[in-house]
A protein has these predicted regions:
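Compositionally biased terminal segments of proteins
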Residues: 1-175
């Protein structure tokens, strides 16, 4: 996904519901800091969705937005990309203080993206192969320092088994 596509999704969502705020979470949030990641040959080139948290949002609004710009919508069929709308409880899985480091989008009011170190921390927690590959790209490419990710992991609420697993993943992608 390119930054222009992400901005289009945000603007379409804003036009539909006029939210107080839109938060971009997930991999596409990286485009706010590193637009080049969506270019050909880059890790987000083949990403076709953006995880959006609309504030405020109720189940009826989420259903309406999904029909309008979600997976399988006419919008998605026409553009080739779509939005996935998240529940507010997703914020409980993020590191404490995440909202202090969000990245704004130039030219789009009331929209921000999760900071790169926070995205990487979430991806390491998930641990899917594609997530680990993305984290490795961020670290090896010098886009995010392992120490910054470690700090965000330290600020997450993790059970002991997750702590061991997540920090092992960080060591793995840092080498």
């Amino acid at each position: 996904m390119r930054l222009s596509a992400l901005k289009h999704l945000i603007e379409a969502t804003q036009a539909l519901c006029h939210p107080e705020r839109i938060r971009v979470l997930g991999s596409s949030a990286l485009l706010a800091s590193f637009p080049e990641l969506g270019e050909p040959g880059q890790p987000l080139e083949i990403s076709f969705d953006a995880d959006l948290l609309i504030e405020p949002c109720d189940p009826q609004l989420a259903a309406m937005l999904h029909e309008a710009v979600g997976e399988g919508s006419l919008f998605a069929q026409r553009t080739g990309y779509h939005a996935d709308f998240l529940r507010p409880d997703i914020l409980e899985t993020l590191a404490a203080g995440w909202e202090l480091a969000v990245v704004s989008f130039a030219g789009i009011a009331n929209a921000s993206a999760l900071a790169p170190a926070d995205v990487a921390a979430v991806k390491l927690r998930l641990g899917r192969p594609k997530d680990l590959q993305l984290c490795r790209h961020l670290i090896v490419g010098g886009l995010v320092a392992p120490e910054a990710i470690r700090a965000r992991l330290d600020a997450m609420t993790l059970v002991e088994s997750d702590i061991v697993r997540v920090f092992a993943r960080l060591r793995e992608v840092s080498n």
